[in-house]
Amino acid sequence: GMVKNYWAGVKNLQNQLFSIVGSALFAAGLWLVKRYFLSYSWRGMLLTTGVLLNCIDMPFVFLTVFDVVRNQYFYLGETVLVEVPAAANFVVSTFVIVEMAEEGNEGLVYGLLTTTANLGAPVARAIGNQLFGLFRPSLSDSANYIADTPAFRRTVASSFALSYAFSFASLGFLYLLPGQKEEAQRRKREWAHRPAYALAIVL
């Protein structure tokens, strides 16, 4: 966004090169999970990767916002470092979806849950835009980034802090997930099947 373009000064070529490196690390992360972490607790892995993703991001963001380090290579380093935990997060989320599907409707369940999950990002972005629109000075005005006043830096930092707070708060719902495939199968056998539950989750 604005921080990346105006304060970190990220150029398109460097951005694309780091994206390629990030994709390679994402693939490496998928292999690591397959090789070493398949039997680990899903809740534990999602908690660990969720915390790591935020904790890795924070220093790069705040050091750039407060003009401690403003360098495109420094800022892009974060996009590379998060790829391994992001891969683990992705794999575990996929495992949960696969295990929750009943035999014969795996494709339907996978499609429904992945579509619902994919809707989360644009909906969250829309809500975030409305919420961040309340901040003053405006976070969407490029002139504020060019002026780069201490007051505006604090405003930008506050918006990021709010984002991190929501991200950490979402981890509080992890207890709803099964711990591993055995628990997922047990829940499917023993828990009551109610359409209202599915509707509530989708909404």
Regions found by a protein language model. Give the residues of each.
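Loop-to-transmembrane helix entry
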Residues: 1-25, 46, 73-74, 155
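Loop-to-transmembrane helix entry/capping segments in MFS-fold secondary transporters
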Residues: 12-13, 101-116, 193-194
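Transmembrane alpha-helices of Major Facilitator/SLC transporters
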Residues: 15-40, 49-61, 121-124
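Hydrophobic alpha-helical segments of secondary membrane carriers
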Residues: 17-18, 49, 78, 94, ...
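A membrane-interface helix-boundary motif in multi-pass transporters
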Residues: 43-44, 130-166, 184-201
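C-terminal transmembrane helical hairpin of 12-TM major facilitator-type secondary transporters
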Residues: 44-92
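A gly/Pro-rich, aromatic-decorated transmembrane alpha-helix motif that marks the paired
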Residues: 58-62, 119-138
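Intracellular juxtamembrane helix-capping segments at the cytosolic ends
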Residues: 88-102, 106-108
